[in-house]
């Protein structure tokens, strides 16, 4: 819905087929469940954006090739405005992923630090400053997908997704 034709062509199939793992970079230590109060900043440097900040509770961040990060691009407007989503290469210089160890020793969740991470302008997802609308769409789709995942155990849900993809002919 928000991706450009080039983004759809480049990223959607490997994401859909799980050839490439993606993560969502939403939550921040000081924001709790108030996504709009985030403090991770993306500053336009002319060629792209420089991102600085921290995300937490990032599921599979340590395995992800790509991430969807929501940032503040305009600090001078109300908090639900001035947010922008980007596609970020998790292997970029300045991305530091730190696993959060659970009592079991496992670490599906991570803290992710961004220090002067360069993101090209073509990696904006949606429109500059329209990140709140994008976040609502992502979260609503996620909730529908979770609710729709009530399938019989062993029924081959990933195989079903790949079949749906192949039927779309993208």
Question: Where do the model's predicted regions map?
Answer:
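A structural signal for short hydrophobic beta-strand segments in well-ordered beta-sheet cores
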Residues: 40-43
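Glycine-rich beta->alpha junctions and the first turn(s) of the following alpha-helix
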Residues: 95-170
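Short glycine/proline-enriched turns and hinge-like loops at secondary-structure junctions
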Residues: 34-36, 60-64, 79-82, 106, ...
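FAD-binding glycine-rich core of flavoenzymes that anchor FAD
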Residues: 1-28, 46-47
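A short core secondary-structure module
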Residues: 52-98
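Residue-level signal for inorganic ion chemistry
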Residues: 4, 86, 114
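Short Gly/Pro-enriched turn/cap motifs at secondary-structure boundaries
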Residues: 30-33, 57-60, 75-77, 101-108
